[in-house]
Amino acid sequence: MSGEIVVGSKYHPLALVSAAPQRACERGGDRGSGPKRSEACKTTTTFALSQLPPGTWTLGTIDWHTRSQPNRTPKLSGRINVPVHRGSILRNDNDDDDDRSSTVRVWLKRDSGHYWPSICQYMPAGATSMHYCVETRQLFVGLDNGSINEFILEQDYNRMTAMRDYLAHQARVTGIIFAADFEWVLSIGRDKLFQLHSSETGQKLGSYQTDAWYTALQFDAQSKHAFVGDYSGQIAMLKLDNSGVTFITTLKAHTGSIHTLAWDSEKQLLFSGSFDQSIIVWDIGGRQGTAYELQGHHNKVTALCYASVERLLLSGGEDGVIVCWNMAANRKETAAWIESDVCQACGRPFFWNIKAMMDQRQLGLRQHHCRYCGRALCARCTSQRIPIPAMGFEFEVRVCDQCHIQLKSENQSSLASFHDAKHSVIGMDLDAPRRRLLTIGQDRIIKIWDVSALFQ
């Protein structure tokens, strides 16, 4: 047996963590153009078909060779074809998933390089979220019925023992974090509740309710703050202690539901990925309300992983693309959009400015904005397109003529690289020290990537 573990479940697995698909839909091929996009020109596939209980599951490896950027392309080192919603890396060459029969499975990597299920734990309901603590081997599984089951995995990962059940929620559990330093279990659910429990006693310590489903959860152990994203696109910042939960503030910027959060404990940066196809970087530590926008996906952003030492952010989305963002680069805050009744360049009125339309005897125009300066302009005055990597715009965006001249004279080299995941990503987990990335797709496949090239 070699040393890597992945744990998962029908809705949510654990050690290299990924998530189970809502439907099977293989989405191969190119996902659109972008700076530094890797073009797969040769694929070598090795498969070993194993006879497993009901159905045939495919275990194998795929090595990708690319014509462009050969030293900056992640290599697919493992693949498991099985119904999964979540998954994680346990740092032991094992993998956990759950299938349609409401089971949690631990997959061990054999000397042959193939993954084999060593544990198949049947659950009273479908598993929808999961958290695994490597140091204590504690596994917390959130269920579709709102409860949380706690397990202990044996050292050989061939057995898991049930320890405690938490009656935490009245609807599906959508996120769990175990804070080992404080022995806290943080959870969120579709009942619009954030719950804080003690793993030592099993007692509830506090809760907080909002007006929308909670969909994403992150925790900063240093400051004891929890960040909770919801279906309306807002992020609540909560202060936790043994006496309960205190609301601090709300972060508002996204126009779509929050699906994933990541945290940089050193720089105190919060990363949020949304259904509005954008990523926002919130400078929590700076306390100035600064937020940077990252635009590199053509569909919903569903997963974020951050490597603090290398200062790299990995994002995955339903467009089937993994984007590697250089967060060590100097970035500029997104310009605020100015509102005006007339074009701030040529003075022609917009269509709601009836008085100016009558005075100038012309039809009103539609309002647009320059993405660099934020001025309100008409279409004719914002006809130029250019990428602005320093502001997070990796694709061409609308700018005014004046800003276009300025930007063309500056270096606009891309600050991100784009890689085809070959499936629509719904979950990711990163083991940065070992340079391993796990992705789970809507095609019900777990993929384990060697991302050493991205960290060079």
Language model features: what each stretch is:
Residues 72-74, 103-124, 136, 144-164, ...:
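Per-blade loop-tip surfaces of WD-repeat and WD-like beta-propellers in eukaryotic adaptors/scaffolds
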Residues 2-3, 135-137, 181-183, 222-224, ...:
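Short coil/turn segments that connect the beta-strands within blades of beta-propeller domains
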Residues 12-16, 68, 79, 83-89, ...:
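Canonical WD40 repeat/beta-propeller blade segments in eukaryotic WD-repeat proteins
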Residues 371-390:
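Cys/His-coordinated zinc-finger cores
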Residues 342, 369, 377, 399:
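The −1 position to Zn-ligating cysteines in a subset of zinc-ribbon hairpins
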Residues 8-11, 98-101, 142-145, 181, ...:
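Conserved strand-to-loop turn within each blade of WD40 beta-propeller repeats
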